[in-house]
């Protein structure tokens, strides 16, 4: 869990920006989106193979 302590004389906008950056670096939102809905194993395999195909194709 990302935590951000608001320092003295720091604006809320700056603290929010630091919080958003820490959340994106930790990968919390990506993990949430990945687990939001159940994916059958066959669908996971299909998506994984499509991603590999995209990486190979310049």
From Swiss-Prot:
GO terms for biological process: translation. This is Small ribosomal subunit protein bS21. GO terms for cellular component: ribonucleoprotein complex; ribosome. Belongs to the bacterial ribosomal protein bS21 family. PROSITE patterns: RIBOSOMAL_S21 (PS01181). InterPro entries: Ribosomal_bS21, Ribosomal_bS21_CS, Ribosomal_bS21_sf. One of its GO terms (molecular function) is structural constituent of ribosome. Keywords: Ribonucleoprotein, Ribosomal protein. The keyword Ribonucleoprotein applies. It comes from the Bacteria. Pfam families: Ribosomal_S21.
């Amino acid at each position: 869990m990302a935590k951000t302590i608001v320092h003295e004389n720091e604006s809320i906008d700056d603290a929010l920006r630091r919080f958003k950056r820490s959340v994106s670096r930790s990968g919390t939102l990506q993990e949430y989106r990945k687990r939001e809905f159940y994916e059958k194993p066959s669908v996971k395999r299909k998506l994984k193979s499509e991603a590999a195909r995209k990486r190979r194709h310049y």
